[in-house]
A protein has these predicted regions:
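Acidic/histidine-rich, metal-coordinating catalytic segments
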Residues: 12, 87-101, 124, 129
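Short, well-ordered coil/turn elements that cap or connect secondary structure elements
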Residues: 3, 87, 111-115
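RNase H-like polynucleotidyl transferase catalytic core
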Residues: 33-41, 110-130, 147
């Protein structure tokens, strides 16, 4: 049974690397061995992402430097602003990254405990977080078997996919379905 007074969000962080990934694919038999270009770099771009499990709405934030307590705090506040307009309580499912427990936002969470809560997954269990499926789908649609000459091309490809998901989205709702 669904609780209509709660917005349940699954959230996580991810890095998409410029070098992409190669996977098996079909090619016509008359084509000689194809050459897939591959950027010899480890440059990457990081994102916070969250899926509202009720309707598949996706929210993301690109991080320029690194993930830490301050950047996670800003993302939590944006999730709360999104859901508080509907009058629902926000419950965020997240992993046990150290900065998710930061003292920086502990007081804020206590002040807003009536309408905001973090719910932690068991340690070392990413398979329980529904948003991991979104990261896998994003990699498959945007990064597999593609060459990116620079990081800006990676950002453009990933954010074009993300922009399709910012409103209610049946694809993500089904992908992340708990009920």
């Amino acid at each position: 049974m669904q609780d209509e007074t709660v917005d349940l969000w699954a959230t996580d962080e991810v890095h998409f690397q410029q070098h992409g990934s190669r996977c098996q694919m079909w090619i016509p038999p008359e084509t000689k061995d194809p050459v897939l270009r591959h950027a010899p770099t480890r440059r990457s771009v990081g994102y916070f992402g969250a899926v509202r499990l009720r309707d598949g709405r996706f929210q993301f934030c690109r991080e320029a430097d690194k993930f830490n307590g301050a950047t996670f705090f800003a993302f939590m506040k944006s999730l709360r602003r999104t859901s508080i307009r509907t009058g629902r309580r926000v419950v965020v499912i997240t992993d046990n990254a150290r900065y998710h427990h930061a003292r920086l936002h502990k007081e804020w969470r206590e002040v807003h405990a009536e309408d905001f809560a973090l719910d932690y997954l068991p340690p070392y269990s990413p398979e329980l977080n529904p948003i991991e499926r979104v990261w896998k789908l994003t990699r498959r649609r945007c990064l597999h078997n593609r060459y990116f000459p620079d990081l800006d091309n990676v950002i453009a490809a990933v954010e074009a996919e993300f922009d399709q998901w910012t409103n209610r989205n049946e694809t993500l709702r089904r992908l992340c379905a708990i009920t």
